[in-house]
Amino acid sequence: MSESNTFSLSLELLENFEFKVDFDEYGYIITDEPPPLGNGEGPNPARLVGAAVANCLCASLLFALKKKKQWLPSMRADILGEIAKVEGFWRIVKINVEIQADTAAVDPEILNTAVQQFENFCIVTQSIRRGIPIHVELKNKTGATLLSSD
């Protein structure tokens, strides 16, 4: 039996390349492109992808440990993303995530098992690695569809 959950958020253009991304009950963030396109008033989408990957990996490691009643007192991650032109268009071509975790109090056997499993628990990383089908619809103000693509 398969399970499925959905999530939603909304995005609104404020000015230039600055957007308000509304996460409903979680509040909102402002995103922007760096100069010369935008004014750098917030993280750009590529940084959000990097943050999502690293956050999910860290949460997945915690999940794998918590299943065995283990916990990390501290953890941080550093992300280095690389963008490059691919077939004439800018793309994220690599995301390096370095996680530093205080594992001193974790049972070594449980830690070893968690290290082998945690990436499989990460929804974001595994989805990006496999490729995510994305359906795009572009509509004008009257609701007429200008583009529908997969």
Which residues fall in each region the model found?
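Alpha-helical metal-binding/catalytic segments enriched in His/Glu/Asp
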Residues: C56-L57
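Extended beta-strand/beta-hairpin segments
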Residues: M1-A51, L62-D150
